[in-house]
Amino acid sequence: MEINSKPMELLVTELNMLLKLLDHETLSCATEEKKMAVKNLLRQLQPSVTAKDYMYVNTSVYRNGTSFVESLFETFDCDLGDLKVEMEDQKKEPEANHTVTKPSKTDSPPPLPNTPPPEDYYEEAVPLSPGKMPEYITSRSSSSPPNSIEDGYYEDAENNYPTTQVNGRRKNSYNDSDALSSSYESYDEEEEEKGQRLTHQWPSEENSMAPVRDCHICAFLLRKKRFGQWAKQLTVIRENRLQCYKSSKDQSPYTDIPLSLCSVIYVPKDGRRKKHELRFTLPGGEALVLAVQSKEQAEKWLHVVRDVTGQGNGLDSPSSPMIPKKIELDKWCSAEKQTSDSDSMPSGESARDIRENGKPKRGALSELTGTVSRAAGRKITRIISFSKRKPPLPGDSRSSFDHDPRCGYVGVLVNRCWREHWCRVRAGSLYLYQEKGEQRVPHTTVGLKGCEVVPGLGPKHPFALRILKGGAEVAALEASCSEDMGRWLGVLLAETGSSADPESLHYDYVDVETIANIRTAARHSFLWATSTGSRTYDEVPFETEQENERLRGRAQTKRRSSFSSSDTGKPSPQITLKRHGSNANQYGRYGKTRAQEDARRYLKEKEDLETEIDSIRTALVALRKKKREAKEKMKSATDKQKLALEECVTKLEDSCRVKEGDRVDLELKLTQVKENLKKSLAGGEMEVPTESKPAHKTQRTEAQYMESFLPVNCASEMRKRPPSIYASTKGNVMQKAKEWESKKGT
């Protein structure tokens, strides 16, 4: 019985379409066996369908389930002769001018492309069923040349394809028609939604690759290398292991990861990441990052991983944990990162290096580990810029600012961006410099008189301070920690002259412990700034002043040594106390006002202590006298009187012991006051005016006390001192000093 070729051809086409539809359905075992039997019969019938040597039927499942050939013929209502061939084929075959008959819907499908696949030709294998050939999803990125050949996998593809003939001349199985090949999905953000993917049935000759045999899913995916580069590799999931091959010709994988021991995370593409990523992480190991083309493809791989590891079967404790809500968490972290990056934008060269075209540069390490906090970034910036710091100049008044609470690095809000500057508070003004130790004029100066300091600037900046003047914000500062915030708060409150107490301010967005740290630091810095001499330090170089003072002291000593003894006995109208460099370096650089006030205060304390000590000594003399009298009476008293006298003596002894303890405490305190007085006199030049009236005993006594502590450089001056000074300095200490000098002289 002769079979018509056209009905038979139509039957084969429809059966192939039916088989393709059944491939995507869930079938029973019996139906699956029947389907495989029909498919095997079709393979045997296909070579004898037409008079040609071999007819390859190219079928595909479109998104709506219809045949690729049928949908193509319904869409394109034109002659196949209108499809142009490449110019190279026309040169090789000049006899291509021939007539082409108009095809019908029952004609054979169009030929396969005959151009080599592009460089980044992309394939993805559909999970295999028993006896079913693998299917591949092909795509190409626009960035690669159209005629490049993939290494390894595609070198022999042209030889494996049979030749076909469709209504005319014989051709190779490849064609240059891009309409028949699938469009691509670009990795670029703006081309994510381009194109649609088509599934092609490849001939059985292509199934001979060893890596893809018996695999659940396979594809050429991009793998991230150590330093951020991407390399294309054949990735296969076989049994419960993830394997990567550098080439499809390799027999053994160079990366083999057990899926039952690793966690899988899907990271979607966003403004920072240019690719959809799958991260396979082993406990205590590095992450294997693979790039997929779309979210759908990532979900397909995740579904296969779940099936392989047992999560798809509803196990209670999956061996390969999947982190829930990872996408939402990454989006939230990304938004927080972008906000913090814009808030903590660095300045200078670092800003130009970090930000380019409005997007931050990120390396491979930062992409794997995420972002760092603003404080850590600020510390890293300081470490990097440590070697760039300028050495102190010879004329610099202070070689180090680290111990001055009024100086330090602080974040400043400039044009809605936070920049780090070196700040210094001095003379009621806030000076902002680009770097520490700059000698130039500060680029910003803020007057602090009459301003108000308010802590806090929202939940993202809990350690910020706002400086308000007349209700308007003139500056916004941000410290790196609670201690720095308290230090700056206390200094600014003192400089602004505000009556607000650091503990009475309202602190938002910080816990109780942090508030306690802020208040403690603010109280200390406030007390330091409001002390007697916090704002009277010399801000000028002091070494030259020391040399000048030494020269003046030597000249004045020579002049004084030539005076007569009668001149030295007279009180001078004013007493000038010189400043000595050795003591000044030891006790700090004091200003003139600070030295005068400290000297007066210590002199007054010294007088009060000496008066109190004298009263205690007088009381002790009286108590000891009573005790001696009581003991004398005990010798001639009766027994009853002795008991009463013994109790009286005991009480007197206790009183003497208490008084003696008080005297010792006051003596120690007096010694400390005298030491402080020496420091204050050595720290600055003091002029104590005395009135010309000889009856004013207080100022005369004050002058005598101060003169007693003058440094003596000449033995003749020591002998010229009046007896009153010797009387005031008598004691065990002076006696021992004199004995030591006499021993040293002999």
Curated annotation (Swiss-Prot):
This is Actin filament-associated protein 1-like 1. May be involved in podosome and invadosome formation. Residues 98-107, 562-575 have a biased composition (Polar residues). SMART domains: PH (SM00233). Residues 350-359, 736-746 have a biased composition (Basic and acidic residues). Residues 139-148 have a biased composition (Low complexity). Residues 108-119 have a biased composition (Pro residues). CDD domains: PH1_AFAP, PH2_AFAP. The keyword Coiled coil applies. Residues 214-310, 406-497 form the PH domain. GO terms for cellular component: anchoring junction; cell projection; cytosol; podosome; stress fiber. It comes from the Eukaryota. Residues 88-206, 336-371, 539-596, 723-746 are annotated as: Disordered. Residues 591-682 form a coiled coil.
